[in-house]
Amino acid sequence: MSKTIVRKNESIDDALRRFKRAVSKTGTLQEVRKREFYEKPSVRRKKKSEAARKRK
């Protein structure tokens, strides 16, 4: 879990910007979106192979 402590003389907007950057850097939001709904293992494998094919 990401924590952001508001510094002295720092606006809430700046602290929120730092927090959002930290969350996106750790990939927390993407992980939540990925796990929002159950995905069968066969579907997961299919998506993984399609992504690999798309990268090449």
Curated annotation (Swiss-Prot):
GO biological process: translation
UniProt entry tagged with the keyword Transferase: no
Keywords: Ribonucleoprotein, Ribosomal protein
GO cellular component term of the entry, any: ribonucleoprotein complex
InterPro entries, per the entry: Ribosomal_bS21, Ribosomal_bS21_CS, Ribosomal_bS21_sf
An example molecular function term from Gene Ontology annotations: structural constituent of ribosome
Pfam family, one: Ribosomal_S21
Entry similarity comment: Belongs to the bacterial ribosomal protein bS21 family.
Name assigned to this protein: Small ribosomal subunit protein bS21
Species: Geobacillus stearothermophilus (Bacillus stearothermophilus)
Taxonomy of the source species: Bacteria, Bacillati, Bacillota, Bacilli, Bacillales
Gene: rpsU
